[in-house]
């Protein structure tokens, strides 16, 4: 009897079993990704880099706060990887045709000959970056595309940090990640062998470090900012000029934001030492950076030149607006900026690429309005952060617009600044809907009135029959 009355114990597997299950599940997921390393040994480095690119996203702690956010981030981390595989093994996607082929061809030549291009700036810097990878790990088309995917996923992580900083500590939402990560032009160009993923990454990181300096000025953060600004400016002359202006802003913040006399003296000494050669280098490179140079002509085969001419004839999102009305004299700057930001206009849409460019411009315009709204509604340090990020955005876009004459190139030039624009724009929309007063309907709610009348009658009858009162019925 006593044995029958003994409560039944619920047997639970030990924690080690759960650990083994997790290990088994992780092995099931990773094994198919590691298999190509054995099957395609010439691309082993590319496959490992793709795994590292995916690990950047799934192991980023803020993305693991909840399942919807984690699944969204994991999906967005897989998209550049999938596009890199398509570009490497199946077909060349739009955005990675002419320029990407030229970069690959030149990088392979440099890795074999050791004839490094000079100066190490702009396209030459990117060719050297690819050639260095080829010299260490061997020539591989997948490796070149995998490095772009790695830069794109690292940019996703930096975007999350930037949004959190701009929004005052808010957690990024899945829809915010989707708006940032699924922009068609950014997706296609970041998965190709192009400079765009690295331009976007280092521009966003430079803005992020600038905001950290505005919050708490530290010398270590300032040196990290210098490294990021240098990495941002090395890819293109427009970005080098932008980095120079941001460096001036950071120096001004350092002089204003510290009470230490010794630190102010140190910043005052460092600024001329850093800015003078940086300004000379940036302006010199900007004046010297004129397309198409003899090196570029040599890089493109005759077939590539023919393809460029075909694209120019058929549009393909690259129609020129250089001869639009008002594009002469002093008026060229504001009018050129408007065309750079808005073109193609609705009546200029001639194909699907133009339609995509039009829709992206409308999205960017809405995000710009949201950014201005964020500045108007925010206060204190948050408003300072928005002002700095908005200044960086307008500076780089104004510099880009001065040297851009077709909306196909403009579509690529919008990519580096899209991270700060997206973060500010979405934060501004959230502030607007949070501050907007609730509008009351003019028509009375009949059902609510009936319910109110019923409750009033019930409470009146309850008062009449309460203790101490007399029931007149």
Regions found by a protein language model. Give the residues of each.
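Transmembrane-helix motifs of polytopic, lipid-linked glycan transferases
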Residues: 57-61, 146-167, 366-370
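Short acidic/glycine- and proline-prone juxtamembrane loop motifs at membrane-interface regions
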Residues: 191-197
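Membrane-interface helix-loop-helix junctions at transmembrane boundaries of multi-pass membrane enzymes
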Residues: 165-166, 171, 212, 216-220, ...
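Extracytoplasmic catalytic/substrate-binding loops of multi-pass membrane glycan-assembly enzymes
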Residues: 90-106, 116-129, 138-139, 330-334, ...
